[in-house]
């Protein structure tokens, strides 16, 4: 025979257990150079700029398409 729970799991206990299952909200900002939405502290994928400066050795999506 299988083991059965001694008591019914309450809704509150069930919901408390599920509090950490939500996906985190990404912090999006607009790029100062091209105004596209990007994640904070990342190089812009469209123009290759970070903090107003062009990043060396980074190929943006615009250059990859050509």
UniProtKB/Swiss-Prot annotation:
Ranges of biased composition (kind: Basic residues): 1-18
SUPFAM superfamilies in UniProt: Zn-binding ribosomal proteins (SSF57829)
GO biological process terms held by the UniProt record: translation
GO cellular component: a single term: large ribosomal subunit
InterPro entries xref list: Ribosomal_bL32, Ribosomal_bL32_bact, Ribosomal_zn-bd
Family: Belongs to the bacterial ribosomal protein bL32 family.
This protein's name: Large ribosomal subunit protein bL32
Organism the protein comes from: Mycoplasmopsis agalactiae (strain NCTC 10123 / CIP 59.7 / PG2) (Mycoplasma agalactiae)
Gene: rpmF
């Amino acid at each position: 025979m299988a083991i059965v729970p001694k008591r019914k799991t309450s809704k509150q206990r069930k919901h408390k257990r599920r509090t950490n299952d939500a996906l985190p909200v990404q912090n999006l900002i607009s790029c100062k150079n091209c105004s596209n939405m990007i994640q904070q502290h990342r190089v812009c994928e469209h123009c290759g700029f970070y903090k107003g400066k062009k990043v060396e050795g980074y190929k943006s999506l615009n250059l990859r398409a050509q």
